């Protein structure tokens, strides 16, 4: 149990996908203008990353490795992610039409989110078992969501703040992201891998 807790804390805080590995920057900067859309995107991405991580482990372990087709790993993972995203889109459309309209084009763009493919490939490269893959996928998504929600909250406050003209828009957003990355560096000694 301690191993899974360390994996969770290490992935969310120490090895955050956005601030440390620089994966998923497009939705991080694109969807984080409003807190509501960041929360919705975070929930959808959490669902997709967890399911894609587990699905990729199953496909790699039971199909690609036994049949010696590991060279098709990236292509097969992209297909798995596309199927999971389509499933997520159908679920969100049925359960929350308002969230579906709010996310708009960003929901299908989860397919091209490099963080989703990154978590699937890292699971395989790190040699995780099924449960570790599920925890790692969920942890990576939780870290992604945490950072995106925090960033959206900060950007909403910056929208009404008196920011100097040269720093308005994407300039202050990138400065804020850099400061968040520095803040998360403080967690570096928390977990040793």
UniProtKB/Swiss-Prot annotation:
Protein's cellular compartments: Cell inner membrane
Residues that span the membrane, as ranges: 5-25, 47-67, 72-92, 102-122, 134-154, 171-191
Primary localization: membrane
Domain of life, per lineage: Bacteria
Cross-referenced Pfam families: Rnf-Nqr
InterPro entries: Ion_transpt_RnfA/RsxA, NqrDE/RnfAE, NqrDE/RnfAE_oxidrdctase
One of the record's GO cellular component terms: plasma membrane
Subunit structure: The complex is composed of six subunits: RnfA, RnfB, RnfC, RnfD, RnfE and RnfG.
Family according to the record: Belongs to the NqrDE/RnfAE family.
Primary role: Part of a membrane-bound complex that couples electron transfer with translocation of ions across the membrane.
The protein's name in its UniProt record: Ion-translocating oxidoreductase complex subunit A
Upper classification of the organism: Bacteria, Pseudomonadati, Pseudomonadota, Gammaproteobacteria, Enterobacterales
Gene name, Swiss-Prot/TrEMBL: rnfA
